[in-house]
Amino acid sequence: MEFPVLTVNPAKIETACLVVPVFKDGDLLPAADKLDDASERLIGQLLDRGDFEPSLGNVQLIPFAPGLGAERLLLVGLGERAKCGESQLIKALDAAFGAIAKLPLDDVAATFTDVPVGERDTAWKARVTLEAAHRACYRFDEFKSEPAPAPRLSSLTLLVGDEDQAAQAELGARVGAAVGEGVSLTRTLGNLPGNVCTPRYLADQAQRLADGADGALNVEILDEDALEALGANALLAVGQGSAEPSRLIVMEYRGAEDPEEAPHILVGKGITFDSGGISLKPGAGMDEMKFDMCGAASVFGTMKTVLGLKPRINVIGVVASAENMPDGRAIKPGDIVKTLKGLNVEILNTDAEGRMVLCDALSYVERFKPASVVDIATLTGAAIIALGHHASGLLSNDDDLALDLLDAGENAWDRAWHLPLWDEYQSQLDSNFADLAHIGGRPAGTITAACFLSRFADAYPWAHLDIAGTAWASGDKKGASGRPVGLLTQYLLDRETEAAETRPSVE
């Protein structure tokens, strides 16, 4: 999608449709005011007569726009000015572009950058505008025999007030477009059925990403023979009941001037289907366990975004992928497995398999001497009980890293909530038969899952994002959300800014 930024009078812009946000209090925003003057108070009259109610998310298409360069206007309600925050703007954007996606339009223009949203600047508003456009145009219909017509939108022009705003808008739109593409890839991988999206399929997707990266991405695939030689028995144990072989996928992007600069590493849980194994899940809703690889999908999506933005830091994406199935060879409750780190783990419930593939991946990445490691996983139902479907759970062994991730989530409006990782919880993992058990009972399930992972992440700053409640939606809108690509991308961009400030200047 193209995203030109212009400073022209909105009344003169030639476009198939001009999207105009309107507050409920009747005071028009600067762009809408200019349009109103040029069209003999078209917008004002609609509001005065009650023909358009600018409640939050309400939209109305005006098919003819006399006196204006635009062929059509799309009015979108912002609700009350005093209540307009980030969530309200994003809801209005989703409503506007949801309507646009249903129309036969190739190009539109929008004036959302003049909407006041707290202390958010033009760059942020441009970013979320592009993200919303990509979100609305996303379709997953490759298994539909007669798919609906795809949205035609290919160009979104952002209208701003002056050149200073234009520079900010261009920067924000570039990030928003890249995040939008990364989110779309994440959603597609998550939405694919388990008989298509297998560990081998994910490995192929990594190679495909590298093939289109002009040498910017190096990929290494560790198959089961390599994993066995390595000693990654926890990862292998999860997949040993499946006909689908497990994989460890490593994607390396070296964007820093020094290729040996400590990388930031993302580790994704890639359980391409989770039946629960011998500890079999209930049948109702088991189809949604294809989404148990959404952590891995978010790593793919973030790496795609990184390739689009080319930050000057080193980033490594690692995906630990397996299929968890019941079989005569499958792991059983009571089994003890020796991990890559050398710790012996007692398996108490085979449906707690994500932490097993992750623990070996966390041990593996130690060889890169990372600046930070963030793992992303649909790990615990307890995270949904604690946080619902709005915030991802965040736990970390490093308070500075946790704060950086929280800040990134607030900036990207892809938020997380910090939970404690206190030593007092560790005793719940005590085992009579092994070095530790891999689950700690019902109390504090999200925390004890992170406690388990922390045993394998003690050599570097590490954080864990539990996205069980945010990775996908159920019901009529069932599908992968693409989260937390926005948070992860912002975290990496912030690390690029931080690195630029600390690198010695060259004279």
Swiss-Prot record:
Mn(2+) 1 binds at D274, D351, E353. Its cofactor is Mn(2+). GO terms for biological process: proteolysis. It catalyses: Release of an N-terminal amino acid, Xaa-|-Yaa-, in which Xaa is preferably Leu, but may be other amino acids including Pro although not Arg or Lys, and Yaa may be Pro. Amino acid amides and methyl esters are also readily hydrolyzed, but rates on arylamides are exceedingly low; Release of an N-terminal amino acid, preferentially leucine, but not glutamic or aspartic acids. The keyword Chaperone does not apply. Keywords: Aminopeptidase, Cytoplasm, Hydrolase, Manganese, Metal-binding, Protease. Binds 2 manganese ions per subunit. Mn(2+) 2 binds at K269, D274, D292, E353. Belongs to the peptidase M17 family. Presumably involved in the processing and regular turnover of intracellular proteins. Catalyzes the removal of unsubstituted N-terminal amino acids from various peptides. This is Probable cytosol aminopeptidase. It comes from Chromohalobacter salexigens (strain ATCC BAA-138 / DSM 3043 / CIP 106854 / NCIMB 13768 / 1H11).
